[in-house]
Amino acid sequence: MERWATFDCYGTLIDWNGGIGRVLERLFGAARGGELLHTYHELEPQIQREDPGSSYRDVMAIALARLGAPADEEDALARSLPEWDPFPEAPAALEEAKAGGWRLAVLSNTDRDLLDASLTRMGVEFDRTVVASEIGSYKPSPAHWDEFFAQSGADREQHAHVAASLFHDIAPASALGLRTIWINRLGEEAEPQPDVELRSLAGLAESLDALVA
């Protein structure tokens, strides 16, 4: 029986806060850029709810416009996104899971070309990818998981979802009755409780094996 691990990408595998933060600091200065990162966190899901069919590239541009970025810089996040760094432990953790027989998939609130560029930085081949731009929906809507299970034929009892965002991933996956591993990089409080909590992806393969026997 195939075992599947699905992942969010940005914030879980790729340093989302670091990538966005650098762009905001360049556009608005170090002090204000740091303050605006929190506002950006609130704006992005709001824009996605307003138009679930919009591309992630457009979502980022609209968010920057609402923050007051110059018109010729509204594509700054999309331009920089392919250069955002993986978390240092991510490639090795994925390699270890894959070597242990896990099939890997990414469920991402982004566009196909942007995700493909990011995943080339991981050095690991993923077996499936589901992106918002192709299904017309953004997490926390369950459509990403619906599409993944339809494509892969995976057994839900042989699956776990791994992510850093409670709002976008852990809460909706838990509501679907799926096993979850929360990558709690910021030491936050969890509601709902994930099945497993890690501070990074280090030790992921061991946790997956223990969670899905």
What feature does the model see in each segment?
Residues 1-5, 17, 91, 95-98, ...:
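Asp-based, Mg2+/Mn2+-dependent phosphohydrolase catalytic module
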Residues 1-92, 100, 111-116:
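N-terminal helical cap/lid subdomain that shapes the substrate entry/recognition surface
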